[in-house]
Amino acid sequence: MMYEMVMTLATLAIGKIGAASDARNIRDYPLAGRELKKAAGMVQCLAEEQLPQWVSHKSSSDTLGKDLPVEASIGFCEAFQILCLAVGQQMAVATVLAKPTVPNYSLLAKLCLGISEHMELFNSTMNSKAALEKEKIDSDFFTVIAFETQFHRALSLYFSARSLWDAHDFGVAIPMMKDAIAAMETRKTSASKGIPAIKSKTSYLKFLSDDLKETRSHMESLLQSWIKENSTIYYEDVMSVVPREKILQKGLMMMKPDPYMFEAVEPLLLSTDFRKG
């Protein structure tokens, strides 16, 4: 019965993720974020409560992990909770950007760096605690994770540059934007820095190709307008390197799992004798 219970809860979590993925427009993103927080709470419950109990009651002849679905792994559930929160925060960032008012660029920089850090933490947790389960997952999925990690790190630099420019720190904003553009470039090898290449029409990243081109074009256009504006109006010395104290050292993760708890229920009778004595 333990296996059935674990897989039932895992399926509920996947259902929440499926509901979140059905978000078709910006109005649905807040709901998607809430669904992902619920999913994170469910897999957290599996990782911290239910699966450890199962492991403690298994006999020495049982093999936990080798022949089971990835959802029945403590390490995978730990990692998946991290991923759910990262994607949930993506929904929050997108919601802010869709509003007509000027956003808080400094806050967005911290949120995007928090997303990047959690994507990276998801991957490292899979490597350290769920290596067997990782082998069962399509490797292209982890290319998407690498893309998301670097893309949001580049966005963090971009929003930091916007914040510096608005604060009239023009000489630092310009090199910060240059760093953001460099971070958005396609990496030369899988071990080098940059965005993974979109190699084929079958890649999971193919749908992002046009958006990526548009983002790069926007960043370059904004940089050139800043350079022109600074050289004709502000005349501020432009630094060759962004000072360390101006670079965010740690991101912000606002998303937290919604705790999932099993309700205490009365035992159900297997049969009832209605005969009168």
Each model region followed by its residue ranges:
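Eukaryotic intrinsically disordered, low-complexity segments enriched for acidic and Ser/Thr/Pro residues
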Residues: 1-2, 71, 99-107, 127-277
